[in-house]
Amino acid sequence: MMQDEHGKSKQTLIMIVDDDAALGEMLSIVLNGSGFETVTCQDGLRAVEMFPTLHPDLVLLDIMLPGLDGVQVAQRIRQTANTPIIMLTAKSDTTDVVKGLEAGADDYVVKPFEVVELMARIKARLRTLGMGASSDGAAAKLPEFLHCGILEMNRVRHTAKKNGIDLHLTPMEFELLYVLAVHEDEPLSRTSLLKQVWGYDDGGDAKLVNVHVQRLRMKVESNPEKPQIVQTVRGIGYKFVAPTE
């Protein structure tokens, strides 16, 4: 269950955008059976038109679509909303995956996939959105507020400000920055970040971390080409250094 702007509980709405009608119907049945409300769409342009009215809590988005492809749909959504997006792709090709992530997707699943795998990805993304509902309680152990130099982060309101200016981070960008900041000056491996931020217990794709770091740097760094806040640690991963100016 999610909450509306008045704090009242509402059924979580998942928008399924896939030109495979049979797959869309199957996913709807599975998700409805798990307590989610669903709406399906088979065309990218129609999905963009429907999104502002529906205000879904999460979007399952195929890459190969008529009208507009999934990358274009993700770009349109990200212009106005930070709604979690999970890409569904029949291609594991690096280029397609990276394009989807760069467009604003939070995660991806390669077809054919096990339903249990997709459900795990959905629940992990909704936990990130809800902040603190992780089954192992790990998220609840993180502090609600951080003040690191000129950067302020509020995990309750899901906001990050640099010099008092809102950075407008997506839920995944916020969570990535928050986890790095909690471990200030401590190098974290991509495997560790995949577990702490994305909820992958085993495996996971390092591209998820790399592309999200690139996106994050575009918003938090004064010069993304020479990052001072989210720094690369060769052979390990990344570390957070509190900004002072």
Protein language model regions, located:
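Charged docking surfaces used in two-component/phosphorelay signaling
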Residues: 25-33
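Short, Lys/Arg-enriched segments at the junction into DNA-binding effector domains
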Residues: 10-13, 124-187, 191
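Positively charged, aromatic-enriched patches within helix-turn-helix-type DNA-binding elements
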Residues: 159-236
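Active-site beta3 strand of CheY-like receiver
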Residues: 54-60, 65
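Acidic catalytic/metal-coordinating carboxylates
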Residues: 43-46, 69-72
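Non-catalytic signal-transmission and effector/linker regions of two-component phosphorelay proteins
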Residues: 1-15
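Basic, amphipathic DNA-recognition helix from helix-turn-helix-like DNA-binding domains
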Residues: 75, 79, 84-147
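Short hydrophobic/Thr-rich beta-strand motif most characteristic of the beta2 strand and flanking loop
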Residues: 35-42, 50
